Amino acid sequence: MDSGSGFDPDTGNNKGNGSGGGNGYGERKFGAFFKRVEPFLPKKDLNPRDLRSWAKKTGFVSDYSGETSTSTRTKFGESSDFDLPKGRDQVVTGSSHKTEIDPILGRNRPEIEHVTGSEPVSREEEERRLNRNEATPETENEGGKINKDLENGFYYPGGGGESSEDGQWPKPILMKFGLRDNPGFVPLIYYGLQHYLSLVGSLVFIPLVIVPAMDGSDKDTASVISTMLLLTGVTTILHCYFGTRLPLVQGSSFVYLAPVLVVINSEEFRNLTEHKFRDTMRELQGAIIVGSLFQCILGFSGLMSLLLRFINPVVVAPTVAAVGLAFFSYGFPQAGTCVEISVPLILLLLIFTLYLRGVSLFGHRLFRIYAVPLSALLIWTYAFFLTVGGAYDYRGCNADIPSSNILIDECKKHVYTMKHCRTDASNAWRTASWVRIPYPFQWGFPNFHMRTSIIMIFVSLVASVDSVGTYHSASMIVNAKRPTRGIVSRGIALEGFCSLLAGIWGSGTGSTTLTENIHTINITKVASRRALVIGAMFLIVLSFLGKLGAILASIPQALAASVLCFIWALTVSLGLSNLRYTQTASFRNITIVGVSLFLGLSIPAYFQQYQPLSSLILPSYYIPFGAASSGPFQTGIEQLDFAMNAVLSLNMVVTFLLAFILDNTVPGSKEERGVYVWTRAEDMQMDPEMRADYSLPRKFAQIFGCRCC
């Protein structure tokens, strides 16, 4: 450049000639015509997101490392300003998320045009921009990205979403119908029934396990099934209106199944000869009522909001997994009583859910949605043809005669097979009424004892932890912001009230949120509350049909056990899937989960090895549930000994206690632990969409004087 030119490289203006004269420059030194150049210092912390002069002047937006332009973000629905309840295709205005650098550091378009002109940029503005750049974090690890996205409510983990091929974060799940969508009355009926049909294994198979264990008749089994259908409908409607208001079915949970079997097979109840079913059911009713009251207090008092600070995915994952693993000694040993039915059923379930999961018929993935009812129906039909064809006809053997009255050993074996395999072994159809309305205290007034009440208090705590994980996962799947701690507490309190109803009506187990809801919503892509309410109304009507309960009670026990093997395995996988919110490669996390699961199985096995003296009268698959009366915990206080031996023989309770203590005492960052970050109540008050999703019905809220509850 000519030394006489006064060209300013920043503004592009000529400042005049450099020679002396009347310009006033003659007295200045030659170097005064140019800005002083600072010594060059190499920048070691290079950030590719920092924009250079050309990008600043033109408004260029980088596509580096997952950054997208506005148009790209609109196309794929990955904007942080995305209005989730209205669908991912709608973008609202606002400041962009960290994955996008706005033109010229967040300034609007008129200011961009202003910069590209010939007017100089003031030094103060330049310094302000540089300070703003320095305030931006230069690098972010994956854990930080996940935690930030979770805090903003815009990160959708892999629970149902397909991973992108380029290694980016999974996309949000595109739902057919959102939380408040109303597709019309006829579609609501279809999708409502579809939701409950996909959960049929969890809704009706528990009575097929507990009622025969209590020596109940086939008629009693049909009555308990009808009661469960009624309570499922009522409690689901209550939850959709007064609980968390997420589209979650309430019903008899497997969390309560293991403790119920422990009480049933304890020495005090397994040796009853008269009225064994009614006496045992009344004992269970009293224990469930006490446990439900504890859960109500936990929710309504606000203690649950405090407890939520210590409940994280590292605690939830092994606890829910232990619920399914608790029945590994019951599952196939019971199903193996009729292998010609159980093995084909398990294989068919695996084929439908794994190999044919992508096959669509008439636009519906029937094999994923209806895998359980379709498989059970096909194998039940197959078992019917085996029965009609005489496969289980043994000369001189009658399944109606009690085993104790049969003298021939070979005939005893055949009778055992006939009871578990024949489709006509049940007399529920002949004995059940056409119309039967379940009513409160139908088995008599409940019995209250400290030993069983302590058991159910621990179980209700585990059920609450299970529900917390389900609430969080469901809110992420349905593309809604996560609820506040108060809403979660409200949901837990309502679950306690629902369990209270279950204890009063005598369903045999408590009522809680079914973990399988996550799988159902994920495969049906339907999250409409109205659909669940319509389906629940149908369940209430069907519960009055006594013959329907009789048909379900006629399902062979081997068939029911085979379906439960698959559902319990699904429960394990759904529980472990909560780890996707954490850093799964963390040695801390995998150690806590591994130790909790292993000791959660091993410690109860130590208590279960103290078999009862009368173990010969118990089938092998019931022996692990008979440790309450003969366990090693002996203090001389009979009630306390019974309760502690029973509690420490439950896999899920031991696993929860270990995971809870370890996760909250071993140091770890929030990103590493995947800490649940719930929405603040203040944010909910300012968000009309969130209030519409979670707030109580307006008239009900006005009665209690709460505006945003």
UniProtKB/Swiss-Prot annotation:
Residue ranges, compositional bias (Basic and acidic residues): 75-89, 108-132, 142-151
Region of interest (Disordered), residue spans: 1-28, 58-167
Location relative to the cell: Membrane
Keywords: Membrane, Transmembrane, Transmembrane helix, Transport
Positions of transmembrane segments: 196-216, 222-242, 246-266, 288-308, 310-330, 336-356, 369-389, 454-474, 532-552, 555-575, 590-610, 642-662
Pfam families: Xan_ur_permease
Protein name, per record: Nucleobase-ascorbate transporter 11
Species this protein is from: Arabidopsis thaliana
Gene name for this UniProt entry: NAT11
